Amino acid sequence: HLFYQHNPYEVEWENMHWGHAVSRDLLHWKELNDVLQPDTLGTMFSGSAVIDRNNTAGWGQDAMVAIYTAAGKKMTQNLAYSTDNGRTFSKYSGNPILGPDRDPKVFWYAPAQRWVMALYNENYIAIYNSRDLKRWEYKSRVKGFFECPELFELPVDGNAQNKKWVIYAASGTYMIGRFNGSVFTPEKGKYHYHTGVQYAAQTYNNTPDGRRLQIGWGRVAAPGMPFNQLMLFPTELSLRTTTEGVRLFCNPISEIRQLHRAHYSMGGLSVQEVNEKLKSIKTPLIHAIMDVEIDKGLGLEIFYQGKI
């Protein structure tokens, strides 16, 4: 399932709804009907969704629960739930559940048998706990992040006996540390794990194969098209040891190989020679893996078909 903010009536910002798409392979997606529409509390801003395996909220075992920000005269956090696999949602009669702030990311913290919410404030990420998704208790804060927080655990170098927690925000800055269900204690960072058009990326919890999969918002205008902006290709996150210490890596999911149609390899070439080779490759899309040596003091910009 993929839920996303959008305006179904025009290609300009405003009138935010939650759209819904589903996929069996993360490559091919089917758009379904919108699931959240504006109401008296405001338009539908960002949030997250969980599966309530233990029926903690009382809406049924395995109910799908959306936790979202309503943007009215003030920002509030709200709940909606689905008992038909996300096809339709009912908004909780007790909304709002929390006052100001926005962008709630919620997940189940098994060691303490409770829900955790990471919520953006004007200059920090606030951590809340709940037993039932409806009543939340403030626990701590992490300063220095802006919008759309994420918080999750990853093994270092694939070692399940050595795990660290990662906290990041919309722009891709992150810290590595420890988390006890209520307090995040940073050990390393802040670092930056991506550049380009990605913003406000979210990850999936409890994937069947244990991967930490991420989908981001691509801030790319498309003049003349019947849409504005896009969702980016899914990526897998991992923690790896480098010469500078443990860092967060972001790579396209392995399923991308199913989309490949032709392969080209070249090496030991200058930038000018690579450009000449690329002229003979006629395709609208290219998946490139490059190892580039850059002289000190210089930078590298990559263009394909006139686009950076």
Predicted regions located by residue number:
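Beta-strand C-termini and the immediately following turn/loop, strongest in propeller blades
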Residues: 4-7, 68-72, 118-121, 169-170
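Short glycine/acidic-enriched loop and turn motifs that connect beta-strands
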Residues: 7-11, 70-74, 123-124, 220-223
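A short loop-to-beta-strand structural motif that recurs across blades of beta-propeller domains
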Residues: 17-19, 65, 77-80, 124-126, ...
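Conserved Ser/Thr-centered positions that define the repeating blades of beta-propeller domains
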Residues: 23, 82-83, 127-130, 177-178
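Surface-exposed extracellular loop regions of Gram-negative outer-membrane beta-barrel proteins
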Residues: 122-131, 138
